[in-house]
Amino acid sequence: MKKTRTQPPGTPLFIGAAIAGLLHAAPSFYWMCGGMWLLDTVGPMAVKLQQEGNVPVRFLLAAVFIAKVTGALVPFIDHLRPPAHTWVRIVSWVGVLVLIGWGGYGTFAGWQRVVTGKASLDHPIIAGHTYLWSPLFLMWGLLLCGALFVSRARRQKVSAA
């Protein structure tokens, strides 16, 4: 008889959240290495700092990259080896609040400004935050929220055993 390995509940959502986080981290790495593509969607100050090529900016981008990769992978890796650590889940829930809050506000505010005519998607920074960066934060947060919610029952069952 062949044993089949089943995935812990929430695994597809954890994978989706990790992918969204890594997609958000990739441009930070690219910019850290000196790239300019899509930087105008972040803002003119980011473009100016990148053109100046200051070493502290590179270190800041490295820190942002490491934080995003850590935030993307640690909850997923912790989920795969039960029981999940309580501190990882607590920090992940805080991350969910930040990601959904920041991403939701940015997405909603961007669309609200475009719909009311206060801003135009012709401006790279408005388009970038309305179409790309904020929705990606929101998606990352929603996927992680779903993963943590679905996996909570498993955590309770493992703790009770």
Where are these regions (language model features)?
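Cytosolic juxtamembrane helix and N-cap/initiation of the first transmembrane helix
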Residues: M1-H24
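Cytoplasmic juxtamembrane regions at transmembrane-helix boundaries
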Residues: K2-G10, V74-L97, R154-A161
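C-terminal TM-helix exit segments that contain a strictly Trp-centered aromatic cap at the helix terminus
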Residues: L23-G35, L97-R113
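Individual transmembrane alpha-helices with interfacial aromatic-anchor signatures
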Residues: F59, D122-W140
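Membrane-water interface at the C-terminal end of transmembrane alpha helices
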Residues: P135-R155
